[in-house]
Amino acid sequence: MSASFAGKKLLVVGGTSGMGFETARLVLKNGGSVVLVGNRRDKAEQARQALAADSQISIIVADLMKEEGMKHVVDTINAEHKDISLLVNAAGVFFPKPFTEHDTSDYDMYMSINRATFFITRDVVRNMVDAGIKGSIVNIGSMWAQQAIGATPSSAYSMAKAGLHALTKNLAIELGGKGIRVNAISPAVVHTPIYESFIPKDDVEDVMNSFGSFHPIGRVGTPVDIAETVAFLLSDKTDWVTGAIWDIDGGVMAGRNA
């Protein structure tokens, strides 16, 4: 354990499982405090207990697909957490579907997450700028924002994540002079609970294993694989890194084995 995040408060939007949860664990382990945003109270409480550091953890429960949920997060941040200096935007949904089968509710689902991400980030940044707080933001993007995969048709998801990549670069330019770094990571297939939304839970392990050869490194990613890189980008060790979109993908974007 080190104290590399001592005195720093991290907000993780989508922090009750997967990549966001593991990032929170690393920041807590290294001296920081954490605010987790999740859409289910039972899951948020389970995450708090699993992290076993109640005095350093706050939770905000909100449905980010609804405007009132987004507003609740923003209001809570402004009332109780104006000292946030680190932000990870990890909220997301993933439902592969052919383009011609999409309806407006699918589109709205993805865009609602982007809307919440945009305006929560806006208020965190406002507070940081007003208080002269320097810090770091990391957005969880996606390989699907950079290339299409025939086995998982993801036009709506890809459009949403491509927007997040673009937001990353724009904010890096706007906020660099204020001491706020903004980066994104672009993972390939990572074994997280998100796949249980469209694959029977008992089948997920086999499906993940079937994707191993898709990655030149020979396996799918884990939430810890991603969290280690996210925590690195949050830390002072990457003080000269901003506007970057890092491929954390087991080599997928480098090319193909065959």
Give the role of each language-model region.
Residues 113, 121, 160, 168:
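Active-site helix of classical SDR
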Residues 98-99, 105-109, 207, 211:
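Substrate-binding pocket helix/loop in short-chain dehydrogenase/reductase
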Residues 16-18:
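Conserved glycine-rich cofactor-binding loop
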Residues 126, 173-177, 239:
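Alpha-helical segment proximal to the catalytic Tyr-Lys
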Residues 142:
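Residue(s) in the substrate-gating loop at a strand-loop-helix junction
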Residues 187-197, 254:
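Short, flexible catalytic-loop segment of classical short-chain dehydrogenase/reductase
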Residues 231, 242-258:
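Short C-terminal tail/terminal secondary-structure segment
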Residues 90-96, 251:
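Conserved NAD(P)H cofactor-binding loop of Rossmann-fold oxidoreductase domains
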